[in-house]
A protein has these predicted regions:
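Glycine- and hydrophobic-rich flexible loops that cap the catalytic core of alpha/beta enzyme folds
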Residues: 357, 362-367, 376-380, 385-529
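Proteins synthesized as precursors that undergo proteolytic processing into mature forms
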Residues: 125, 136-138, 160-161, 459-496, ...
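Hydrophobic alpha-helical segments
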Residues: 488-588, 646, 661-665, 671
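Terminal end segments
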Residues: 27, 34, 291, 567-634, ...
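Substrate-recognition/specificity elements adjacent to catalytic centers across diverse enzyme folds
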Residues: 8-14, 19-334, 340
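Charged, long alpha-helical assembly modules
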Residues: 659-751
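Gly/Pro-rich active-site capping loops and adjacent beta-alpha segments
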Residues: 78, 82, 86-126, 130-131, ...
Length: 867
């Protein structure tokens, strides 16, 4: 195996150099060829970090000493135990750098807007994007605000020391290969770098731009179409995360909620035409897309083809989901399960740690570059997270005038735009000036012929989400958990909670902006009338604790019931995973079957709930028109008729249904978008509200279609306004079916028995740095974007990036798995050692028997700390 990997690595390096030559990459971007290929110091002379095993030592820092025991195990975990807390975090920093330095360094450089300093001018738009998000300023403010006597500061301080101790020890043999290719030696790590990774993650989890295309919809489409296509609350029945009864009738037929007015365009600045405004919106959309494209088309991306993990971080529009739930067994035991759906790479975006110190024994997964454990459990509590997906990004159009250059009209007076003067160092060029313009309600992202669009995001204010997880790591009860949760403000999550005392709950606390006018789903007038007036008070924020159903769940569906008194957003996942989880939990709870086995059954479930809504109407339509079907179409009908809705790799019906559902959705809505001149520049085909690639599992259109198909099959929206054809649901379903069979015959051949799902639907673990030869897979895969065991798209590198199940009555029995491995070094046996378990639906016992006794501290009565 080692020889094969050396061959792959050699081919990868050769490919890098050939691509560089063929693309005429500027020589200043790369290290000199002789240095890269030098047998003594180049890529050939690289050694992997240590493999599996345990060792003990005494660590001395600043005249303080601590006993340390470290175990690296083949289940994807690094285990650290010490008699001093500071030593645990120092060692975590050192070992994270040893196994993941390039990964964490590139994430931090990117988010600080410094990637051009290593890569060159091709990624300058990406750096400008993150400078526009004010990342350098925000991270500095966070560091300046830290309480230097706090537990969280101590953890961050010693973690940073540990990272830098490793960087200082770097030799040519241990230098990451990507650094050698680029001729780069890392600078010392800073606390700001850690918070930059925090900002990267919070933007990925909360950044959105749906308001931009929705504004175009409001301007181009009449009110009755907006009302039908984009209801303020989902048109189909959903199980909200927090089904609490509040004030009745909030989302009423007028769309009013707390003074808001949905479905009508917001006021425009004086003298601005609709067309000028639309062109400015299109420019704002292009701002995001250009930042994303700049990275994908950069030198790094060309040298390392296929790099995509950063793509979602840049544009912030990725809609990967997640699942979590908590449930009580008949004896009152609290179970927790969690599987966040993020990019699946090698190395993983996660790194597994068990951290043991005075009063602490926590195990779970962490983001490289951040101290502590992000998701996991300790002997007292367990927690997991899904993205709550509320709206925390708002857009405004400023009132400007040629008579007041450099100013905007706000709250009755003209005010100057604040200018933040940036200098971005670009490799091979030097310093490039870049100005960021700020108004009272956000940063300028587009200025088209005097039409100025600004964005306000809660993440542009200094908050310390990392403190949340450090306090979770040491929490021993609900009160201490809520203390940690109080620090989590941006990138709001549905935090699932279970403890050894039988408490269960889900909490979505954070900064929810309140506005008092207009339609916040669209760009609003920036004259001060529609600004944030505060945030939803904590006591009214969504949560559920010890529900009478004995379970609670979240899967990125709508947060609240329609009578919740505050606006929290409107573009969520479509709720089908949540519906399936609710169905299964209800069954298992009624059976008294809340066990590890039943929780695994739910996590690995591949039933697409949309088949409960669409399959029978399709079969009814086909059965009444069998005489019009071709022999192959009849064969496809028979396969669908006998199908259970499970997306297994060997299912042919799954393939037919998947393509049919896409065509049915497209055939219903695309004529209307064409009729009202919705264009790609407006976001057509990119955003879920305009038939983007996630539209069958995210956003309102698929819910509209389910509602109309089952309840209003003759509704006017099935008509084709372009041709004038009068249609109903049956006609469109048959049209989509005919298109699907023709498409599959063209793609897969004339024999439907060979159209099995695993033939066209695969999982791949892409190399984090995009070296295709070092990716893992692809593998035929079950599931789709609507199944609990999710695999988005046809070549999926998004899905359950971490699976956790724990019974808090016996937390030592907790199980989990993530794909990939500890090491980013491709020749290491720890590069890909957990993938087979993950692919096969298997789990590791997180704290297995046979470890040194220190790792059972706080679990077993006789276990002690080292020293």
């Amino acid at each position: 195996m080692s020889i094969l990997l050396y061959i792959k690595l050699g081919l990868a390096v050769i490919c890098l150099l050939l691509v560089a030559i063929l693309l005429s990459v500027p020589i200043s971007i790369l290290a000199p060829l002789g240095r890269v290929l030098n047998p003594g110091t180049g890529v050939w002379n690289s050694v992997p970090p240590p493999g599996v095993g345990c060792h003990s030592s005494v660590l001395t820092i600043n005249d303080s000493s601590a006993a340390i025991v470290v175990c690296v195990t083949p289940d994807g975990f690094i285990r650290i135990a010490s008699n001093e807390t500071w030593a645990v975090f120092y060692e975590e920093g050192y070992l994270t750098a040893e196994y993941r330095l390039a990964q964490m360094y590139f994430m931090a450089m990117m988010t600080m807007g410094n990637l051009s300093s290593v890569v060159g001018p091709s990624v300058l738009p990406s750096d400008e994007f993150f400078r526009t998000l004010l990342t350098p300023q925000v991270t500095q403010e966070i560091v300046d605000s830290l309480n230097k006597s706090s537990f969280t500061y101590e953890a961050l301080y010693y973690y940073t020391l540990g990272v830098n101790a490793y960087i200082e020890s770097l030799t040519s043999q241990r230098m990451p290969i990507i650094f050698k290719v680029l001729g780069f030696r890392p600078l010392p790590w800073t606390m700001e770098d850690t918070f930059a990774i925090q900002q990267l993650l919070t933007w990925s989890l909360s950044g959105s731009a749906d308001q931009l295309p929705f504004t175009v919809a409001l301007l181009k489409m009449p009110k009755q179409v907006i009302y039908a296509f984009y209801p303020a609350y989902p048109s189909s029945i959903q199980y909200p995360v927090y089904p609490e009864e509040w004030n009745l009738g909030i989302y009423n037929t007028t769309g009013n909620i707390k003074g808001l007015s949905f479905y009508s365009p917001n006021p425009l600045p004086p003298g601005i035409t609709k067309q000028e405004f639309i062109e400015a919106i299109d420019k704002a959309i292009a701002f995001y897309e250009e930042s994303d494209t700049a990275f994908r088309d950069s030198v790094v991306s060309k040298l390392l083809p296929g790099i995509n993990p950063f793509e979602h971080f840049v544009i912030g529009l990725s809609d990967e989901g997640s699942n979590n739930w908590v449930a009580l067994s008949p004896s009152g035991q609290a179970f927790l399960a969690n599987d966040p759906h993020l990019t699946t790479t090698v190395p993983s975006i996660w790194i597994g740690f068990q951290l043991v110190g005075p009063g602490m024994n926590v195990i779970g997964v962490d983001f490289p570059g951040v101290p502590g454990v992000i998701l996991g459990h300790n002997p007292f509590i367990a927690w997991g997270a899904t993205d709550a997906e509320p709206q925390v990004v708002y857009y405004y159009v400023e009132v400007t005038s040629p008579n007041h250059p450099g100013e905007y009209y706000y709250d009755g007076s003209w005010m100057p735009f604040e200018v933040v003067q940036e200098k971005i160092y670009v490799k091979g060029v030097g310093y490039v000036p870049y100005n960021v313009y700020l108004a009272r309600n956000g940063v300028v992202i587009a200025n088209y012929s005097g039409v100025v669009i600004v964005m306000n995001w809660t993440g542009m204010y200094p908050t310390d989400e990392g403190a949340t997880f450090l306090y979770f790591d040491i929490a021993q009860n609900l009160t201490e958990f809520l203390k940690g949760l109080s620090y989590f403000k941006v990138g709001i999550q549905n935090f699932a909670y279970a403890d050894r005392y039988g408490n269960i709950g889900i909490f979505a606390w954070g900064l929810y902006p309140i506005v008092m006018g207009g339609d916040p789903r669209a760009v609003m007038l920036g004259n001060g009338s529609y600004d944030w007036v505060g945030f939803i008070p904590t006591q009214y924020q969504p949560y559920v604790l010890n529900p009478p159903s004995h379970f609670a769940l979240s899967a990125n569906e709508i947060l609240v019931s329609p009578n919740y008194p505050y606006y929290v957003g409107w573009v969520f996942e479509s709720g089908f995973r949540a519906d399936e989880i609710y169905t299964l939990l209800s069954q298992f709870e009624a059976q008294g079957n809340i066990t590890y086995s039943s929780m695994e059954t739910i996590q690995l479930n591949v039933h697409d709930y949309t088949t409960n809504l669409f399959l029978q109407p399709l079969l009814n339509a086909l059965s009444t028109h069998l005489n019009r079907l071709s022999p192959i179409e009849v064969q496809a009908y028979e396969l669908l008729k006998d199908w259970d809705g499970d997306f297994t790799p060997n299912s042919v019906a799954a393939t037919i249904y998947y393509f049919w559902l896409w065509n049915y959705l497209n055939d219903t809505f695309m004529p209307w978008f064409q009729y009202y001149n919705i264009t790609p520049a407006d976001g057509l085909g990119e955003f879920s509200i305009f038939l983007g690639p996630d539209a069958i599992f995210h956003g309102p259109l698929i819910l509209d279609l389910a509602n109309w198909t089952n309840n209003y099959p003759n509704i006017v929206w099935f008509n084709d306004p372009v041709t004038g054809q009068s249609r109903n649901a049956t006609i469109v379903m048959l049209l989509a079916f005919n298109q699907t069979i023709s498409e599959l015959m063209s793609k897969l051949g004339p024999n439907p028995s060979t159209w099995y799902w695993g033939r066209i639907h695969e999982r791949i673990l892409t190399s984090f740095f995009g070296i295709n030869q070092l990716s893992v897979g692809p593998f035929p895969a079950p599931g789709d974007g609507n199944t609990i065991n999710a695999a988005y798209g046809l070549l999926s590198n998004e899905g359950p990036s971490w699976r956790l199940i724990v019974d808090m009555a016996n937390p030592l029995s907790g199980i989990g798995v993530y794909p990939g491995g500890i090491s980013e070094y491709p020749l290491s046996p720890l590069y890909n050692d957990t993938t087979a378990y993950w692919l096969n639906g298997q789990y590791y016992t997180l704290i297995p028997p046979g470890l040194p006794q220190y790792f059972y501290y706080l679990y077993l009565p006789n276990a002690t700390l080292p020293g």
